[in-house]
Design a protein with these regions (language model features):
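N-terminal glycine-/serine-/threonine-rich beta1-alpha1-beta2 phosphate-ribose binding loop
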Residues: 1-51
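ADP-ribose/adenylate-binding Rossmann-like module
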Residues: 50-66
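Rossmann-fold NAD(P)-binding glycine/threonine-rich loop
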Residues: 61-82
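ATP-dependent carboxylate/acyl-activation modules
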Residues: 229-291
Length: 297
């Protein structure tokens, strides 16, 4: 366990190390879970682990959104795996289903509620008639929002997640700076009430669709979502939901808790367990392809 802190009273306190090299040099370490957040030093640590022949599972959405293409290539070159199911949707299984259950589909669009904090705030504004500042303060009090909520309320978190989904579905790496992003900071109680009068909820939607000319359009913005025609309008609280449109399935929705330590841990451990089950194969996961291949000697 790499950490700068000491945990003398923890039953695993003797496993804590302070130098990544200790992990890299240990031949008994075959699988690494990265949950640091941010790009640096996580990128250097993850890349070093992959180059040392250790598979990595991460929950770090910023790392995957900005460096996922490079890390997937490094993993492929060293015949190990780089998994990131926990980077989008917490406990919602969406990364792997896009490449397994839905692999036969020509996917045309992905859209969803990808940030539980903003969804909670908008619900409180809608149901309890709270102003934005009051709803945000409540989210912070309950631990749903950080002291600095910018990444959530300005749409950065949802942007990183739609980048990952876009890259997986449409065969190219989509960087956050290429996505039009508008958060909910300027949404007023009057806006929410006006939407309600039209039979709609206001939701922060991350979406990507293929256009007629073959280009793709990724966006993150508040949208009016009709109650009568969209399941997303009924997704409340800190829950997330992702809808996928394909030529074979028409549309399907993945729903569940999108954040929190236990949902995130569930997804990270699920990746590690899947890796352990595939001890005789290398699961080569890249943007827009996922193949089982024989491992190199």
């Amino acid at each position: 366990i790499l950490d700068l802190r000491e945990f003398p009273d923890d039953p695993y306190g003797n496993r804590v190390v302070h130098d990544i090299q200790t992990i890299l040099d240990d031949p008994e370490v075959g699988y690494v879970a990265e949950c640091m957040g941010g790009v640096n030093p996580a990128y250097q640590f993850v890349r070093s682990c992959l180059e040392a022949g250790k598979s990595v599972a991460t929950s770090n959405k910023q790392l995957v959104a900005e460096k996922g293409d490079i890390l997937l290539q490094v993993a492929k070159e060293h015949h190990v795996n780089f998994f990131f199911e926990a980077s989008v949707g917490g406990a919602i299984p969406i990364i792997r289903p896009l490449h397994t259950c839905l692999a036969a589909n020509d996917i045309s669009e992905v859209a969803g509620i990808l940030n539980g904090t903003t969804n909670f705030i908008l619900e409180k504004m809608f149901c309890d008639k709270m102003k934005f500042a009051d709803a945000l303060a409540l989210a912070q009090k309950l631990g749903y929002a950080e002291r600095d909520p910018s990444a959530d309320v300005d749409g950065e978190d949802a942007c990183r997640k739609i980048c990952i989904l876009s890259s997986l579905v449409f065969e190219k790496h989509v960087y956050p700076e290429c996505v039009y992003t508008k958060g909910i900071r300027d949404i007023s109680l009057e806006d929410v009430q006006l939407a309600q009068s039209f039979g709609c909820a206001v939701k922060l939607i991350g979406a990507v669709k293929r256009l007629e000319d073959g280009k793709i359009l990724p966006t993150v913005m508040p949208m009016l979502v009709p109650f009568e025609s969209s399941l997303l309008s009924h997704v409340n609280g800190v829950f997330n939901a992702v809808m996928v449109w394909g030529d074979g399935i028409d549309k399907t929705m993945f729903y569940g808790r999108g954040a929190g330590k236990l949902p995130t841990a569930s997804a990270v451990l699920g990746d590690i367990i899947d890796e352990i089950k595939q001890t005789d194969t290398v699961l080569s996961q890249t943007w827009a392809c996922l193949l089982y291949t024989s491992p190199s000697p």
